[in-house]
Amino acid sequence: MAQSKRVKAITAAVVPGKTYAFEDAIKILKTATKAKFVESIDVAVRLGVDAKKSDQQVRGSTVLPAGTGKSVRVAVFAPAGAKADEALAAGAEAVGMDDLAEKMQAGDLNYDVVIATPDAMRVVGKLGTLLGPRGLMPNPKVGTVSANPGEAVKNAKSGQVRYRTDKAGIIHCTIGKASFDDEALKSNLQALLLDLVKAKPATSKGTYLQKVSVSSTMGPGVTVDQSSLSLK
């Protein structure tokens, strides 16, 4: 019932078809936020791509300058030595090779991000059926296969988010918490959009950033006027 009231409040405050300056859009969301937990602020970006074509799928990662507000647990596959030490020093919760793989196969999968050095992928490859369905399989496109595991761990813990177009060519991503101030949320959204522009497929035609909408957890979206953002 409470959620229904909140959705109605946001819907009532939004004029159909209108775009809102970022600050106004966030104000609408925050005013209607009544949940007992700190809600996330999410963004949906409709891109001018044909997601059915492999050369127009957009996938990557962005380090949000103001972070995500979430605590991130990281596991790293790296051979013993400098790379493993580097990952531990950066704050990884677990580092290993076959020993770490065995722990995961035994059920130790309480991680938000799994990172691997290129030479550790021979071990990680055996865990595809475990990590793949959970979205944890390391991938160079999103920076989780890296020759610099320490840097990758720091990125993951400091607010790195991963994105990928869905079947409709839309990117869904979290840009922070409702408790963040407006400037922090704005800087995070701008960083994401700038990286999306850099990732624009060469074969994409017409308007690329077609629509940007922000919403609170499980709430309806409010369309953002892109001219209220700094995208250069």
UniProtKB/Swiss-Prot annotation:
Gene3D superfamilies: 3.30.190.20, 3.40.50.790
This protein's encoding gene: rplA
Keyword Repressor recorded: yes
Quaternary context: Part of the 50S ribosomal subunit.
Name used for this protein in its record: Large ribosomal subunit protein uL1
GO cellular component annotations of the record: cytosolic large ribosomal subunit
Keyword terms of this UniProt record: Repressor, Ribonucleoprotein, Ribosomal protein, RNA-binding, rRNA-binding, Translation regulation, tRNA-binding
Superkingdom of origin: Bacteria
Pfam family, one: Ribosomal_L1
A GO biological process held by the record: regulation of translation
Function statement: Binds directly to 23S rRNA. The L1 stalk is quite mobile in the ribosome, and is involved in E site tRNA release. Protein L1 is also a translational repressor protein, it controls the translation of the L11 operon by binding to its mRNA.
InterPro entries, per database record: Ribosom_uL1_bac-type (IPR005878), Ribosomal_uL1 (IPR002143), Ribosomal_uL1-like (IPR023674), Ribosomal_uL1/biogenesis (IPR028364), Ribosomal_uL1_3-a/b-sand (IPR016095), Ribosomal_uL1_CS (IPR023673)
HAMAP family associated with the record: Ribosomal_uL1_B
Family as reported in the entry's similarity comment: Belongs to the universal ribosomal protein uL1 family.
GO molecular function terms noted in the UniProt entry: rRNA binding; structural constituent of ribosome; tRNA binding
